[in-house]
UniProtKB/Swiss-Prot annotation:
This is Citrate synthase, mitochondrial. GO terms for cellular component: mitochondrial matrix. Oxaloacetate binds at R356, R428, R448. Its main location: mitochondrion. The lineage of its organism: Eukaryota, Metazoa, Chordata, Craniata, Vertebrata.
Length: 466
């Protein structure tokens, strides 16, 4: 499994195999996620301790002046267990690619897309769950979903001009009143028990997020109509779409896919790093996740799919809905020559087509192949990369996840673009909270990198070159 694959190098192949078999046996025999974690964590603590004792002084990489001024881009400085972003392959969740997750993770009865519950189980344990384990998780989240009255009152009294992401962040912060970790910490709980309380808070928060998000949507766009009640027989995504007011089974399938693929993207992006940083101060999961959502609300992180839709709409307005390849090329070149970018193309790390784009494209080809906006997106996919390569400036001319997601949401009637980042946030909770559990389990300390002033950096460089 992903947590133990390197054990052979430290403990010997035979002992490592025993650990893997023991973990798999625990996974197969229990539907209680916390029980499985209680079995896995001591083994991983031992593995990490041995690794650090043997290789703690090993140099991982060099830091350049450009890295320090350039947003620490490419700097290796975090341990993040749940996912790894490969420039050529895209994201891998505990070693599994998106196509593998689509194939292996359990699905709803009659459905074709993976259930986010299965992805969360994978992120936490490193194991593909059984249908029974996923069903347990769906029911567990349904049990924990109710919102406290003060949060409901708060959401119902927000002004309608308050951005949905501001409402989400504020409501999650207010849920901190329910934190079992915060209460236990104030009472002096032993640090070896931290992960157990972080687990409980994380499970509660994930369970409540669809209720919070749906209430925001109904208050802003559906005249404050009721979100209804959680159905314990339905999965997490299905309950979410019901509360939003959507009854189309295809939209529920899209939501399962969307919430799965947006869940995690290794640890260096703004929302993941923020939750990791704030959590390292032993802020509870509610405060850590609220901080992450404030980062996600920034236009450089969570608003890209809105920018794509605005650009596509403007394109259609200027050149028409049924545009030739030649006219489309001219429009793209005009966009680039005016100093603007083509939204939805390029990525800070990826150097190939984002597999999150590809799986959304496959969904559209299956369910909405004749939709005019999808046809335009598909047409751009044929044309834009070659133009960007010809221009010679882009390191990655290929589309990313944001080039497609907004078009799919629009097709099923969710046209409120300001709300899209809330969906992103609900999904991202799966990844960052899974990691937060492991950060406390492995005893990660307060994050405190060293900063330097420009003058200090110049003196340092002079001393090196002199």
């Amino acid at each position: 499994m992903a947590l133990l694959t390197a054990a052979a190098r430290l403990f010997g192949a035979k002992n490592a195999s025993c650990l893997v078999l023991a973990a798999r046996h625990a996974s197969a025999s229990s539907t209680n996620l916390k029980d499985i974690l209680a079995d896995l964590i001591p083994k991983e603590q031992t593995r990490v301790k041995a690794f650090r004792q043997q290789h703690g002084k090993t140099v991982v990489g060099q830091i350049t002046v450009d890295m320090m001024y350039g947003g620490m881009r490419g700097m290796k400085g975090l341990v993040y267990e749940t996912s790894v972003l490969d420039p050529d392959e895209g994201i891998r969740f505990r070693g599994y690619s998106i196509p593998e997750c689509q194939k292996l993770l359990p699905k709803a009865k009659g459905g074709e897309e993976p259930l986010p519950e299965g992805l969360f189980w994978l992120l936490v344990t490193g194991q593909i769950p059984t249908e029974e384990q996923v069903s347990w998780l769906s029911q567990e989240w349904a049990k924990r979903a109710a919102l406290p009255s003060h949060v409901v009152t708060m959401l119902d009294n927000f002004p309608t001009n308050l951005h949905p992401m501001s409402q989400l962040s504020a409501a999650v912060t207010a849920l901190n009143s329910e934190s079992t970790f915060a209460r236990a910490y104030s009472e002096g709980i032993n640090r070896t028990k931290y992960w157990e309380l972080i687990y409980e808070d994380s499970m509660d928060l994930i369970a409540k997020l669809p209720c919070v998000a749906a209430k925001i949507y109904r208050n802003l766009y559906r005249e404050g109509s009721s979100i209804g009640a959680i159905d314990p027989k339905l999965d997490w995504s299905h309950n979410f779409t019901n509360m939003l007011g959507y009854t189309d089974a295809q939209f529920t399938e899209l939501m399962r896919l969307y919430l799965t693929i947006h869940s995690d993207h290794e640890g260096g992006n703004v929302s993941a790093h923020t939750s990791h940083l704030v959590g390292s101060a032993l802020s509870d999961p509610y405060l850590s996740f609220a901080a992450a959502m404030n980062g996600l609300a920034g236009p450089l992180h969570g608003l890209a799919n809105q920018e794509v839709l605005v650009w596509l709409t403007q394109l259609q307005k200027e050149v028409g809905k049924d545009v030739s390849d030649e006219k489309l090329r001219d429009y793209i070149w005009n966009t680039l020559n005016s100093g603007r970018v083509v939204p939805g193309y390029g990525h800070a790390v990826l150097r190939k087509t984002d597999p999150r784009y590809t799986c959304q494209r496959e969904f559209a080809l299956k369910h909405l192949p004749q939709d005019p906006m999808f046809k335009l997106v598909a047409q751009l996919y044929k044309i834009v990369p070659n133009i960007l390569l010809e221009q010679g400036k882009a390191k990655n001319p290929w589309p990313n996840v944001d080039a497609h997601s907004g078009v799919l949401l629009q097709y099923y009637g969710m046209t409120e673009m300001n709300y899209y980042t809330v969906l992103f946030g609900v999904s991202r909770a799966l990844g960052v909270l899974a990691q937060l559990i492991w950060s406390r389990a492995l005893g990660f300390p307060l994050e405190r990198p060293k900063s330097m002033s420009t003058d200090g950096l110049m003196k340092f460089v002079d001393s090196k070159s002199g």
